[in-house]
Amino acid sequence: MLSFAGSLKVFVALEACDMRKGFNGLHGLITEKLREDPRPGALFVFTNRRRTRLKILCWDGTGLWVLTKRLEEGTFSWPRDEIGRAHV
C-alpha cells in the first residue's frame, strides 16, 4: 500500500517519454534530464507523445513503485515549459 506525506512534491516531465521504459529507464530520466534524485515524498510523472498514457515513479523508503494509467479515450492535460520540467 502506498501512503503519501502531507508535503508531497510532484515533478512533471514536460517532454514526452517512451512508455516502454521501466524502473531503470525512468530513474535515468529523473537523474539525467530532470536533475533530481528520487526520494521519499516525491512523485515523478511522465506521459507519452499522444498524452494517452501516464507513468508515475515514486520511492516509498524500501523500493521504487511504477504506477501506470492508459486512457481509453481522450488525453491528459499537460503543462508546457521550455526547461523540461514543472514542479507542482
What are the roles of these predicted feature ranges?
Residues 1-85:
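Polybasic/polar functional segments that serve as interface/processing modules
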